[in-house]
C-alpha cells in the first residue's frame, strides 16, 4: 500500500459541496465563474503593480503578495471542487490529499499574516508618514514577507505532520469538497485528541496573533485620524484603510467560525458553507475591493488602458 506506514487508506472520496443532483451543473458554472474572476482579478492586479512604477511602494508590495497568495490557494482548492460537481466519484489519493492539505494551509496561514503586515504598513504610513520610507525599507519589507511565509510553512507542517500520524481505516469518505483538517479527522479510526489540540493551539496563534496586530494597528490609526484637522485628509485616510478592514473581516470571520468552535459541536455541512467564504469568495473579492476603492490602482489602470488604446 502507498501509505501503509500511517494508514489503511490509499485514497479518499470527496463528498463535495452537496449531494443534490439537480444543482450540480448550476453550481459547477457558478464556481467556475468565481474562479475565472479570481484568476483574472488577481493576475491582473499582479501585472498592474509590476508594470506601473508608481505602485512600487511597500503598500503595493504587500498587495502584490496578497494577490499571489489568493491566486495560489484558490487554485489549490477550486479545480478539485469543480470536479466534484461533474464526477460521480471524486477520488483523491492519500498523497494527493496530504499535498492539498499542506499547500492549502500554507497559503491560508500566509494570508492571515500578510493581512497583519499590511495593517502595520498602514499604521506606519498614517501615524508616522515622515518616517514611512525609512521604517518600511526594502529590507524591512523583505523580512516581514519572510516571516509571513515562514509562519505559513510552520503552520502547514504542524497540521500536515500530525495528520500523517492519524490512522484511517475503512471510512474514506471525506464530508467536504477538499482535504481539510476537521473533515479528515472525522474519518480517523484512532484518537484525534492530539490533532484537535494542535488545531486549537496553532489555529489560535495563526488567527489570534494577526488579529491582535490588526486591532492594535487600527486602534492607533483611528486615534491618529481623529487628530487630522482637514476633512479631506481624514477622508483619504479612512478610504485607504476601509478596503483592508473589509477584507480582514471577511477572511478572519469565516476562518474563526470554521476552526475555533468545539470539534464535537461542529456541523460539517455548516462548516462547508462557511469555508466557501475564505476559499472562494475572499480570493475573488480581494482584487475587486482593493481596485474599486483605491484611487492609485484606478489611475494606473486608466493609464495602461489609454496607452494600449493609442498604441
Swiss-Prot record:
Ubl conjugation recorded as keyword: no
Main subcellular localization, coarse class? membrane
UniProt lineage: Eukaryota, Metazoa, Chordata, Craniata, Vertebrata
Against Pfam families, the record matches this protein to: 7tm_4
What are the GO BP annotations of this UniProt entry?
G protein-coupled receptor signaling pathway; sensory perception of smell
Q: Which residues are glycosylated?
A: 5
Top-level taxon: Eukaryota
Which residues are exposed on the Extracellular face of the membrane? Answer: 1-25, 76-99, 161-197, 259-271
* Gene Ontology MF, one: odorant binding
What is the recorded function of this protein according to its Swiss-Prot or TrEMBL entry? Answer: Odorant receptor (Potential). May be involved in taste perception.
Keywords from the UniProt entry: Cell membrane, Disulfide bond, G-protein coupled receptor, Glycoprotein, Membrane, Olfaction, Receptor, Sensory transduction, Transducer, Transmembrane, Transmembrane helix
- The disulfides recorded in the entry are 97-189
The yes or no answer to whether the keyword DNA-binding is present is no
Membrane side Cytoplasmic: which residues?
A: 47-54, 121-139, 218-237, 293-311
- Gene name in the database record: OR8B8
TM annotation in the entry: 26-46, 55-75, 100-120, 140-160, 198-217, 238-258, 272-292
Example GO CC term: the record gives: membrane
Localisation: Cell membrane
Please give, as recorded in its UniProt entry, the membrane topology of this protein: Multi-pass membrane protein
| Family to which this protein belongs | Belongs to the G-protein coupled receptor 1 family.
Tissue specificity comment: Expressed in the tongue and testis.
Identify this protein by name.
Olfactory receptor 8B8
Amino acid at each position: 500500500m502507498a501509505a501503509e506506514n500511517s494508514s489503511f487508506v490509499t485514497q479518499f472520496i470527496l463528498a463535495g459541496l452537496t449531494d443534490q443532483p439537480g444543482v450540480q451543473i448550476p453550481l459547477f458554472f457558478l464556481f467556475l465563474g468565481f474562479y475565472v474572476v479570481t484568476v483574472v482579478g488577481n493576475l491582473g492586479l499582479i501585472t498592474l503593480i509590476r508594470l506601473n512604477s508608481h505602485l512600487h511602494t511597500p503598500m503595493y508590495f504587500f498587495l502584490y503578495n496578497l494577490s499571489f497568495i489568493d491566486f495560489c490557494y484558490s487554485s489549490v482548492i477550486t479545480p478539485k471542487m469543480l470536479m466534484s460537481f461533474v464526477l460521480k466519484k471524486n477520488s483523491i489519493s492519500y498523497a494527493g490529499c496530504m499535498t492539498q492539505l499542506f499547500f492549502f494551509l500554507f497559503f491560508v496561514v500566509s494570508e492571515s499574516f500578510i493581512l497583519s503586515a499590511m495593517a502595520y504598513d498602514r499604521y506606519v504610513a498614517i501615524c508616522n508618514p515622515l518616517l514611512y520610507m525609512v521604517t518600511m525599507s526594502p529590507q524591512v519589507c523583505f523580512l516581514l514577507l519572510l516571516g509571513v511565509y515562514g509562519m505559513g510553512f510552520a503552520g502547514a507542517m504542524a497540521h500536515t505532520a500530525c495528520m500523517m500520524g492519524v490512522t484511517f481505516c475503512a471510512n474514506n469518505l471525506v464530508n467536504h469538497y477538499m482535504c481539510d483538517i476537521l473533515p479528515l479527522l472525522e474519518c480517523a479510526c484512532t484518537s484525534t485528541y492530539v490533532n484537535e489540540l494542535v488545531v486549537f493551539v496553532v489555529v489560535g496563534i495563526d488567527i489570534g496573533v494577526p488579529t491582535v496586530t490588526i486591532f492594535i494597528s487600527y486602534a492607533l490609526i483611528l486615534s491618529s485620524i481623529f487628530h487630522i484637522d482637514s476633512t479631506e485628509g481624514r477622508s483619504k485616510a479612512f478610504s485607504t484603510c476601509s478596503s483592508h478592514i473589509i477584507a480582514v473581516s471577511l477572511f478572519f470571520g469565516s476562518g474563526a467560525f470554521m476552526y475555533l468552535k468545539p470539534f464535537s459541536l461542529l456541523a460539517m455541512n455548516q462548516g462547508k458553507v462557511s469555508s466557501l467564504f475564505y476559499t472562494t469568495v475572499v480570493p475573488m473579492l480581494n482584487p475587486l475591493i482593493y481596485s474599486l476603492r483605491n484611487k492609485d490602482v484606478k489611475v494606473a489602470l486608466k493609464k495602461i488602458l489609454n496607452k494600449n488604446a493609442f498604441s
